[in-house]
């Protein structure tokens, strides 16, 4: 049986290659742009096929399969239909990587990581309903490297088995992981402080906090993904961004609230002071707003992938 060679000819790499040739996909009908992608894909397949033949490889090069062939696409639809008929397909939500420049979802294999310098902030969320456990003048301290996601915060996630300390300071009563108290107080430049109580994370579940920027609540929830190696032990949770946030949010019936459009810009429900800004620019705007209202405890910059 001869080897049947095949080429995967779909995806962003083809579209990006066409755009590098000077083609603007927004200035032509989608069908026309697809025609150019089709022609480019065939051209590359022919080049690679010629190279493979010259290298002396043996295969049935007269009958290759290409994922852009209509018969191949039809077969995919047949398989999908069979899966649907067997009850294997359901409609749901899932967080995916997104490219603002391409306005398209990305596969994990298409994501490249580079070291970048990002702002990291520590923010106070004041208790609104302490459920008889905490007073309303207590603040949970969250940490994030993506300040632009703070407007989408719906929850604060703790680890059920961790011990959390209530610390009295000149900057308010703060809830942080007990093993990080001294380290965090030094970071916040707080020299006069006292630990007045301890709580298991499980004791603080369902307490609500006031979102520092908007008239809505942030729910205290529990999740196994919360670790003790960095941050504060109180994880800023925006279910519309990131897998951990999304899946733990589902357990508490929190919506996957996304306030960023396909271009990577903040949407109108973020408020006039933020709407229209690209997420990288929103980092600074959100941080300044938090500082202005007294919710920002610390701003640092870190290098990470």
Regions found by a protein language model. Name each.
Residues 151, 155, 162-234, 243-247:
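Protease-associated
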